[in-house]
Swiss-Prot record:
UniProt keyword annotations, A-Z: Cell outer membrane, Membrane, Repeat, Signal, TPR repeat, Transmembrane, Transmembrane beta strand, Virulence
Protein name as it appears in the record: Surface lipoprotein assembly modifier 1
Task performed by this protein: Required for correct export to the cell surface of some cell outer membrane lipoproteins both in Neisseria and heterologously in E.coli.
Cellular component terms per the entry's GO annotation: cell outer membrane
Length: 488
């Protein structure tokens, strides 16, 4: 016989547009000496351990299955007239995790008056999970578990769906229950992998890095040394040791909620120019919600900064964030931050800031991604309006892994404008408010063959340039460094 396989394309004549073309019907219809199937409504089909059978690779299923020279053409009406064949096909599709088969057979099976409600509910859950409707799948699985608590196959799917939807506490409970079941070794190994992943989600995450940088113009002195009768500071070059260390922990709550706490310290040390040493340390804590597609939260923070080894300022603030996967390849990242800075050296420099950032990331494949972003930053100083400005920025990044060579690169470009409320010292002579234009570029290169204890060094070259109608604020800065980062 010949049975066509249907997976979204029409291979049959127009008069048979609704024909079901599934190989699994062959065994259901023509199996020799097949014993009569018992009533599916009384069968404990959800107590099987075979729920995690690997899905059928649809690309390897032949379009036609030949046997005895016959051709079987079955449409929905024919199946409805043969409830036993329809039930066999539905059951076979479910236990083999044949998503394509479930998608075709389920709508017809639901029209059958003598249907197995549990089988239909299970199929609806599998299909919803495959289509990314995880909350709907969880609802179906929970209804099934309530009816049949001793169903490890369903519980495994429920636990996986909860894990996927970031309901970590509920997922951990289900996986703990599964661990007590007498499951096959392969499934028990899968349960342990999930439990390990859940522990890692809530474990402390520590990251750090350092680099040695050769910098040009570390004091950000103007490009000109003379302007009229004024003499500006000379540009200072130097070597810096940059460092960063941070730790963060997440505590999972019910229904996808979580709390976080963390701290970090970063800065740079100039061995030959200690007056330029700069360090920032901060702590933060917050609450958030995450599921399969989005992650949103609110965090409060406190930061302290030292400059030249002396206390310089501290900042208190809050940050909102919302990240969402729009599609499997497109992701949006949004955040808003407000903070109040207190300058411990000069009270007239106290200010508040507001920052809003939006990014769009496109993951072309596992080896390439593109990112574009828009930023707005506003700083206000009640005591000195000359420091007040708005900054409008654009960002672009391109990450690439170059084929099988092992070489990877990351290119970053940024441009921004600063509009000040009042003229600067030199722009005031022209009767103009201060206006700055910024340009930032950097290129990072690394090779996966070069690593030591899990650390792959990155070579980075960067250039920063500011052009201004106030000559004192025009400068260029170049850096070259090798960076070492580690997360554990």
């Amino acid at each position: 016989m010949v049975i066509f396989y249907f997976c979204g394309k029409t291979f049959m004549p127009a008069r048979n547009r609704w024909m079901l073309l599934l190989p699994l019907l062959a065994s259901a219809a023509y199996a020799e000496e097949t014993p009569r199937e018992p009533d599916l409504r009384s069968r404990p089909e959800f107590r099987l351990h075979e729920a995690e059978v690997k899905p059928i690779d649809r690309e390897k299923v032949p379009g036609q299955v030949r046997e005895k020279g016959k051709v079987l053409q079955i449409d929905g009406e024919t199946l409805l007239k043969n409830p036993e064949l329809l039930s066999r096909a539905m059951y076979s599709a479910v236990v083999s995790n044949n998503i394509a088969g479930i998608r075709v057979i389920l709508p017809i099976y639901l029209q059958q008056a003598q249907q197995d409600k549990m089988l239909a509910l299970y199929a609806q859950g599998i299909l919803a999970q495959a289509d990314g409707r995880v909350k709907e799948a969880i609802s179906h699985y929970r209804e099934l578990i309530a009816a049949q608590p001793d169903a490890p196959a369903v519980r495994m799917r429920l636990a996986a769906a909860l894990f996927e939807n970031r309901q970590n506490e509920a997922a951990a409970d289900q996986f703990d229950r599964l661990k007590a079941e007498n499951l096959p070794p392969q499934l028990m190994e899968q349960v342990e992998l999930y439990r390990k992943a859940l522990r890692e989600r809530d474990a402390w995450k520590v990251n750090g890095g350092f680099s040695v940088t050769r910098e040009h113009n570390i004091n950000q002195a103007p490009k000109r040394q003379q302007y009229g009768k004024w003499t500006f500071p000379k540009q200072v070059d130097g070597t810096a040791v940059n460092y960063r260390l941070g730790a963060e922990k997440k505590w999972s709550l019910k229904n996808g909620w979580y709390t976080t706490a963390g701290g970090d310290v970063s800065g740079r040390v100039y061995p030959g120019n200690k007056k330029f040493n700069d360090m920032t340390a901060g702590v933060s804590g917050g609450i958030g919600f995450a599921d399969r597609r989005k992650d949103a939260g609110l965090a409060v923070f406190h930061e302290r900064r030292t400059y030249g080894n002396d206390a310089y300022s501290y900042t208190n603030g809050a940050r909102l964030y919302f990240n969402r996967w729009q599609t499997p390849k497109w992701q949006t990242l949004s955040s808003a931050e407000w903070g109040r800075l207190k300058n411990t050296r000069r009270a007239r420099s106290d200010n508040t800031h507001l920052q809003i950032s939006n990014s769009l990331v496109f993951y072309r494949n596992a080896r390439q991604y593109w990112m574009g972003g828009l930023d707005f930053y506003r700083e206000r100083n009640p005591a000195d309006r000359g420091d007040n400005f708005n900054r409008y920025g654009l960002r672009f990044a391109w990450g690439q892994e170059w084929g099988g060579s092992g070489l990877s690169s990351l290119l970053r470009l940024g441009a921004a404008k600063r509009h000040y409320e009042k003229p600067g010292f030199f722009s005031g002579f022209k009767g103009e408010r201060r206006r700055d234009k910024e340009l930032n570029t950097s290129l990072s290169l690394w090779h996966r063959a070069l690593h030591f204890k899990g650390i792959t060094p990155r070579l980075t070259l960067s250039h920063r340039e500011t052009r201004s109608n106030d000559v004192f604020n025009e400068y260029e800065k170049n850096r070259a460094f090798v960076e070492f980062n580690k997360t554990f």
